[in-house]
């Protein structure tokens, strides 16, 4: 009996692994084959290149310039591509047949949501790491501060992707999610002129503090928690909408 029980547990574990593998593969395939994702990646890459060329051209011989000095401005431009990618990834689920395909591969909506979160997180980390790494290499000087700034930038870009995707999944409207993401992420630093110190609780303005080279540790921690809270809230809202939706 014990041998049969062990064999049964092995088969069950293998079955679960296969199901998760299929779900992750399906979600990754959707991300890779969605044309809008590639266009968004091109926008982000172009923004990174143009920003670095502009900054390096504006500094005398580029001497002493590190990525920690560039990160806030760099993020303002590059995050546009990540916003577009996140909204596009979520929008494809309810505006095309991809959503039904996902449910056929993984009928359990909770597991599907986790698989989607894992794939988007991995995609954001890889894409942002490539862009940040190239920009770090383009800077004349590299220091510990620059590496820390690069790491925080990778975190922020991944958060932008997840935040935008969460808004898209929760609102189920490309226009609505795009508008919300633009206000919260892209326009937030400009809104600080009208909102004053209250704007720091918006993710876009919190990111500027998170990436600033001269920000205090307390301010950086507060900004990081603000970004985490917004990202988690958007993802939870999207997951709840997916689990409760009829299709």
Predicted segments with their positions:
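Single transmembrane alpha-helix segments in multi-pass membrane proteins
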Residues: 86-98
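Internal alpha-helical transmembrane segments of multi-pass membrane proteins
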Residues: 175-179
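C-terminal and late-domain segments of enzyme folds
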Residues: 204-206
């Amino acid at each position: 009996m014990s041998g049969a029980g062990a064999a049964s547990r092995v088969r069950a574990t293998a079955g679960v692994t296969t199901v998760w593998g299929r779900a992750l593969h399906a979600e990754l395939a959707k991300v890779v084959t969605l044309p809008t994702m590639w266009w968004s990646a091109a926008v982000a890459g172009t923004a990174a290149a143009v920003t670095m060329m502009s900054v390096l051209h504006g500094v005398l011989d580029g001497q002493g310039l590190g990525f920690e000095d560039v990160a806030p401005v760099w993020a303002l431009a590059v995050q546009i591509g990540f916003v577009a990618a996140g909204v596009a990834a979520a929008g494809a689920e309810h505006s095309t047949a991809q959503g039904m395909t996902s449910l056929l591969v993984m009928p359990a909506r909770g597991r599907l949501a986790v698989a989607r979160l894992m794939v988007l997180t991995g995609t954001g980390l890889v894409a942002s790491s490539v862009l940040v790494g190239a920009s770090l290499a383009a800077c004349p000087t590299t220091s510990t501060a620059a590496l820390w700034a690069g790491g925080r930038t990778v975190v922020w870009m991944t958060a932008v992707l997840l935040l935008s995707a969460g808004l898209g999944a929760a609102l189920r409207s490309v226009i609505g999610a795009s508008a919300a993401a633009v206000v919260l992420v892209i326009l937030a630093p400009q809104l600080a002129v009208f909102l004053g110190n209250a704007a720091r609780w918006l993710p876009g303005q919190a990111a500027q503090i998170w990436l600033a080279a001269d920000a205090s540790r307390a301010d950086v921690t507060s900004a990081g928690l603000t970004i985490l809270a917004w990202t988690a809230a958007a993802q939870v809202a999207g997951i709840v909408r997916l689990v409760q939706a009829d299709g």
